Regions:
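Short capping segments at the starts of secondary-structure elements
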Residues: 8, 18-27, 111-116
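Charge-rich, solvent-exposed alpha-helical interaction surfaces
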Residues: 12-18, 29-37, 56-60, 73-80, ...
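Charged, low-complexity interaction regions
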Residues: 18-29, 39-47, 65-68
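Short glycine-rich, basic-tinged beta-strand/loop micro-motifs
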Residues: 31, 108-129
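Charge-enriched amphipathic alpha-helical scaffolds
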Residues: 37-64, 122-159
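Long, low-complexity, charged/polar intrinsically disordered regions in eukaryotic proteins
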Residues: 43-94
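An N-terminal amphipathic alpha-helical segment
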Residues: 88-116
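C-terminal engagement modules used by replication, chromatin/transcription, nuclear envelope/ESCRT
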Residues: 149-176
Length: 176
């Protein structure tokens, strides 16, 4: 069973589209493809209704594109009308959000892999030590999203066994 926290939420999609700086046409293509071909990756609440998903993502994109003054004004208005719900939940699993972004980049940006040293990945999340529990959480996120890790030479590896200074490549799982 894949946990809901490893499913794409409107926030994840909006962050990807914002960082990608895609055209409106490309945004619609990505949303449409996600809904039609990767529906199982979307959180349950948005699976049956494409327009609900699209509206939620576009509302978030509109907020992300505001400047500071406009953002604070919009935030105040939203608080006044109490339009704060499940979409504003803060995700506590930083690895889930990070690997969901990588999944979207690998699926839609035309790149076939992302590479990083495990030491840098841990440093970016402010971890000083590599514990078994931490590696298991990372591994769970990778497996839930269908991401595989490789060393140089396309050699499969498990994140728990990789060395800190090994260059790790993250790729989409190939379907057979």
């Amino acid at each position: 069973m894949v946990w809901t926290k490893y499913k794409l939420m409107p926030q994840d999609i909006a962050v990807y589209l914002f960082l990608e700086n895609a055209s409106h046409k490309r945004e619609n293509e990505i949303l449409s493809d996600l809904f039609e071909n990767h529906n199982q990756m979307i959180v349950w609440d948005y699976r049956p209704d494409y327009f609900l998903l699209k509206r939620s993502v576009m509302d978030l994109l509109n907020l992300y594109e505001l400047d500071d003054r406009e953002y604070h004004e919009a935030e105040r208005i939203l608080l006044e009308i109490s339009q704060k719900g499940a979409d504003s939940e803060i995700e506590t699993d930083c690895f889930g959000a990070y690997f969901k972004l990588i999944w979207m980049q690998l699926t839609y940006s035309g790149i076939s892999y992302r590479k990083i040293k495990l030491r840098n990945l841990l440093r970016d999340f402010n971890y000083k030590r590599r514990t078994a529990a931490l590696m298991n959480r990372m591994n769970l996120a990778l497996n839930a999203l269908g991401l595989k890790m490789y060393l140089r030479g396309y050699e499969k590896c498990d994140i728990r066994d990789a060395g800190l200074d090994d260059m790790i490549m993250i790729r989409l799982e190939t379907k057979k």
